[in-house]
Structures are given as structure tokens and as C-alpha cells.
Amino acid sequence: PAFDRWAQNIGELRSTTPTVLFGWCGWMLVILPLLLGLRFRRDRVTVGLVFLALIVATAGLTLHHARWGYFVALFCAMAVPWALAAQRRRWLAWMVFVVSLWPVAREWDHALYPTDAAWRARAENVADAVALRDAAIRLRRLPEGGVMAPWWFCPAIVWWSGQSCIGGSSHQSLPGIVDSCEFYLSESLEKTDAILTSHQIRYVFAYEPARMISNSAQILGRQPISTPLAEPLFRHPKSSSARLESIYANRYFKVLGVRAGQGL
């Protein structure tokens, strides 16, 4: 159950829609099977049938999991010359091809000229990334130890700090992801102490609590308590526990050290 709930946060594991597929492949996604079928009927070219089967299969898989989108786009691009050859009038084939790219052009237009809301979201993501790097590199010269952090930040923290993290963005990190969610949602110091000890955690990252609490609650499938640990760790890091010491803080992140031989 935890895997299914966690997978909802991973873009490539989500289902997609025909509109998204058209943004990747254009309207050729609909036209190609028709042209490939026509080409096979007229010339008996089996390659067209192979492309037809691959496009239909990968398009269906992409509707289930977006990670298959790379393949459907690749097969569509490879099949275009074979499919357009079914139309003997080249000018018509080219016109169909160019017009079919309209959804792709619209997608690029949205990417290059985002709305105000999309632009603000991008700016926030960039600011998050800069602040995370600034916080993570502070651990480079510190003693080696495990890092407790929101799971989606763990790969970047490992890269910039050289320290090991409890979680990651892979399903193989799921046990650590679940434990990190338990940690940030918990109010039981005994339980968090057990998590820190079992993973040999030496450093704790605190981040904007609303996102951490909502994501942890979603993955664990339960409602958070009134004041989860994520809240005091970020709002009042120095007073959240006598066993924690402040190492570094910026606008978005707080880095706390677990005193040697102690948990929370």
C-alpha cells in the first residue's frame, strides 16, 4: 500500500491522458496507424505493421504509466517516413505532417512562455534547489553520518554533501522513505529515536512543514497529529530538542546535528 501511495508522487509512474500524448507526438499519433495500415494494404510492407503494433502498444502503456512516453515518441518519429509514403502526393503528405505538429508547437509555447503561476512555480523550484545545495555542501567537511531529510531532496543531498541519506527517489528506498515520513509526522520522541538509531542518523534537515506533513501523511495513509515533529524542527529548531544542535540555516532549510550517541 505504501508503494502505491508513494508512486502517486512520481511523475513517470502516473497515468497520462491523450492530450498529453498529443503534446509529445502531435496528431500523427492518430494519423500514423491509419497511414501504416494503408501502406501495408497497398504494398504489403511488413515493417509498417511492426511500427503499427509498437505504436499502439506503447501508446496504451503510456496511458497507464507516463514513463513509456519516450518509446511511443521514438516509434512515431521512426514510422513517419514509412507512413507518409502511403500518400503519393508529396505536398499533401507534407501538409498533413506540418499541421499534425500543432499540439507539439502549443506545448513548446507553454514551456517557453509560461503563465504567471507556472513561472512562479519554476522560480520557487530554482530557489529551493539553490538553498538545498547551499545547505548540503555544509556537510562536506563534517564527520560522516546518515542524513534524515525529505525523500525527494535526498538524491541532491547525497550528491552535494557526500553523505548517505535515509531515502531517495527510487522504489528501492521505500523502507527509508516510510521511516522518514514516520519521523516527520511523529510526536513520540521514543519512536523517532529508534528511527535515528537504526539508520545511524547524524544530521537532520528541516524544510517548510506544510509540504512535508501533507506528503508524509499521504504516503503513510493517515491523518497527521495536531503538531507533528516537522513543525517545531523548522519553526523552532533550537528549542525542539536539547539533543539537537543547529549547524546551518537559510530561508528554506535548517540543518541540525544529532549529538553524538544520542537521538532526539
Q: What is the role of each PLM region?
A:
Residues 45-47, 55-59, 246, 252:
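Helicase P-loop NTPase motor core of nucleic-acid translocases
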